[in-house]
Amino acid sequence: MDIPSILSTCKPDLAPYESIYKDLHKHPGLSLQEYLAAETAAKGLRSLPGFDVRTNIGGTGLIGILKNGGDKTILLRADTDALPVEELTGLEYASKKREVDVEDGIEKPVMHACGHDMHVATMLAAAETLHKAKEHWKGTLVILFQPNEERAGGAKAMISDGLYDLSKHACPAPDVVLGQHVMWFEAGTVGTRVGSFASAADSFRVTVYGRGGHASQPHRTVDPVVMAAHIIVRLQTIVSREVDPREAAVVTVGSVQAGMTENIIAGEAVIKINVRTVTPETRTKVLAAIQRIVKAECEASGATKEPLWESTSSFPFTNNDKKTTETLSEAFLNVFGDKFDPETGPLGGSEDFPILATEAPNKSGGKGVPYCYWIFGGVDPEKWKDSVENGTDIPINHSAYFAPVIQPTMATGVDAMVVAALTFLK
């Protein structure tokens, strides 16, 4: 039986998975606090006879292993965490949740503003489809639900917790690792590309030190707010004046914090910086420029001591394996036709997904197996058409208004994941 026939025969009714999606969307969990998503994923996998489910890997991470003969192993990955965003979609199942973030102890609004709830529901439906289609494929299927993607810690944590240690979690090393992400493109579409597909990302918390005092006596202080302001403005020149225009890079200061009230000059300021780059050379150059600028501005301002640098996250480059991606693209083209784009432009965002492949043991005795990552659209086709024709705004990932239309988004995501799995297991 060919793959399109397997899809039409074995794909389950998606209504229960739509309900799962709505429940997860209404009750999200911040990074490191994805308890409902993990519970839901484990319950779904355990409902399918034959899956060996292992939980609490690197936090709330879990896997389901289905052995079905053969000698090939593939790993399918979905992420589970939400974001500190106050939802403004107006959906009947919108999140109203607030919770204390275990990272900093601050209470925050929580929203699935990046679609990871869709990833969980879609993966569970794909798992059921593949379970029903067991007679049509051979090999070992590993379904992995990963926490803490947004802060780039989940994949590393699962690896550090012995994900591929057979004696600990019984997870065999995969021959190929596959993953997908819902994005702000037309629902029903799928896209990927060979090679560079997502940028590297580096985030820092930088503390600069002045000398606090009374607001009426600035001459007796060293104002860290002014110091931070000079740093922020100067950082904007890195991309415009130091990066080759043929390259791509982004330097964003997403948070600045100093002082408690207007009549006191603070003693220090904290700047949170996020950097995106698409080549190792540019990454090295931009990070060096940031350090140079911060150090120089602190010295020029008379800082009382050297700035404190703290790395808060680091995402690798996502470089899709050529052979794997070309093989999968052929299969996607056969199923999705002109709704599939094999030359999708590089994503501005970043992923820790590749770590699950680059840290996997391979048959040569080293580390690193092939991987492919792709996207599927979540925007209502009519809204997409209106945006193309009239320029109306479409909320993007991480927006308080980001709300994938449930169908055909979910059906497309299920089909894509099943097609990918069967392509390497048939």
What feature does the model see in each segment?
Residues D2, D13-I20, Q33, A37-A41, ...:
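General structural feature for long, well-ordered alpha-helical segments within catalytic domains
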Residues M1-H112, D117-A125, T129-G139:
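Acidic/His- and Gly-rich active-site-bordering loop/insert found
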Residues V53-R54, E149, V194-A198, T344-G348:
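Short Gly/Pro-enriched turn/cap motifs at secondary-structure boundaries
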Residues V226-K426:
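Metal-dependent amide/peptide-bond hydrolase catalytic core
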Residues L83-V85, A94-M111, D117-M118, T129-T252, ...:
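Histidine/acidic-residue-rich, glycine-tolerant segments that coordinate divalent metal ions
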Residues I63-I65, R205, Y373:
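Conserved hydrophobic/aromatic beta-strand scaffold that supports enzyme active sites
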Residues L24, G64, L76, H116, ...:
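Divalent metal-coordination and catalytic microenvironments
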